[in-house]
Amino acid sequence: MIFLIFSILFLHLANCDYTPDWESLDNRPLPSWYDDSKFGIFCHWGLYSVPAFRSEWMWWYWKGTQPDKDVVNFVDKNYKPGTTYADFAKDFTAEYFNANQFAETVKTSGARYFVFTSKHHEGFTMWPSRTSWNWNSMDIGPKRDIVGELRDAFKKTDVHFGLYFSQFEWFHPMFLDDGKFNTTFYPEQVSYPQMIDIVTKYNPEVVWSDGEWDKSDDYWKAKEFLAWLYNSSPVKDQVVVNDRWGTGTMGKHGGFMTYSDHYDPGKLLEKKWENCMTLDKHSWGNRRDMKASEVNTAYEIIEQLARTIACNGNLLLNVGPNMHGQIPAIFEDRLEEIGRFVNITSEAIFGTRPWIHQNDTSASNVWYTSKYSSGKKPLKNLYQNVYNFQLEEHTIVYAWILDTSHEQFELKSVKTTKNTTATILGTDVVLTGFEESDSMIILSSKIDWKKLPRRDIIVLKIEKAASYLRNPLMSTNEHHVQ
């Protein structure tokens, strides 16, 4: 079986557009749907949701090279002597799991894509993997194809479906032996066939690799996999991937960059990137002792979304369901609150590009996004796909004012003309009467605060601001366009 898989792959690679080397693979254009989508929901769910203690790394903290005393004590106190991690599987019932409800919750959040953990570092697969016998959601625990049910549910929506996949497994005997004997049995017989399996069975539009850092991209056969994915897979035209494909690849190779978890550069990056973060500030997986104060507020997430998309990133926000298959109510409440505002301000988010400024040069906590009114690029240059120029007749600027406590807001990055207007999204309020000026001033007294969808965030749609050129990637110099 393994020989057949590799034979098919090498036959495909013989006549293909992309070859298994980074020079070729890194030249593949990123499908536009991903950049346009801006906001996604991540979901970490696996066997670790049964003990639900510390984080999804619980097994490693319990039985790894340096056991955590608190985790060891937790198991000793709450489980019978001799308990193993595999014993948790019988309690992983998922009896309340409803894939359609998951899809509806994601849809309510306003997110445009969804990424689910098909397998985390524990090795338990959430689909019936042939290379993970009796250690998958069909053979034990829920006895359901969780990935398949989610794929079918998201097919009914316009939300893109993606899969996270951990390359390594902490305690898999083959992986441990490979480290001892410099062999490659684990990728050849386990992880590589699993990647092919999830793509061919479930057609994910995102393949989100992780757990790669301990071995090289050659060990994981990452380049061979990506060449097949881009050339011959059933999702070759629309799939996107991240940058975690082996030691030293993060931030260098792949589709979009992640650089690290919770990455927030605060400046424009030329390469498309993603900020993956959690609603629970301390864990990706479900945590039984999580406190309400440890959950990010809707404001904090919206603020992070604005900062991220202003700098050419996407935001991937994680939730962790419990062992019964329920997304915690506090997470659902947060997603609903976020979704209300995202849907009201959607034109300032989806399909936008960074502007010539990412945040304001003077006003505190103001971030910018932009788009062209015609939907077409009126000027072309090397960075036309990274940011939009400021052209009075073409550019719409969205100013995300994230600190509304001032009596006036002076936006020094926006130069006004007599034709400039500013609409407060979510209201029918249009501010006019601007003069030719090197900054835009909005008086708090001119705002009908009762009409705002939120009083702690204002999003302005600015049209016909004065033209001027600035390359935010190369210099701070600017000049007016006549």
Curated annotation (Swiss-Prot):
Gene3D superfamilies: Glycosidases (3.20.20.80). Its EC number is 3.2.1.51. It catalyses: an alpha-L-fucoside + H2O = L-fucose + an alcohol. InterPro entries: FUC_metazoa-typ (IPR016286), Glyco_hydro_29 (IPR000933), Glyco_hydro_29_CS (IPR018526), Glycoside_hydrolase_SF (IPR017853). The record marks C276 as: May be important for catalysis. GO terms for cellular component: lysosome. Keywords: Glycoprotein, Glycosidase, Hydrolase, Signal. It holds the Pfam family Alpha_L_fucos. Residues 1-16 form the signal peptide. GO terms for biological process: fucose metabolic process; glycoside catabolic process. The keyword Signal applies. Disulfide bonds: none annotated. Glycans are attached at N182, N343, N359, N419. One of its GO terms (molecular function) is alpha-L-fucosidase activity. Alpha-L-fucosidase is responsible for hydrolyzing the alpha-1,6-linked fucose joined to the reducing-end N-acetylglucosamine of the carbohydrate moieties of glycoproteins. Belongs to the glycosyl hydrolase 29 family. This is Putative alpha-L-fucosidase. It comes from Caenorhabditis elegans.
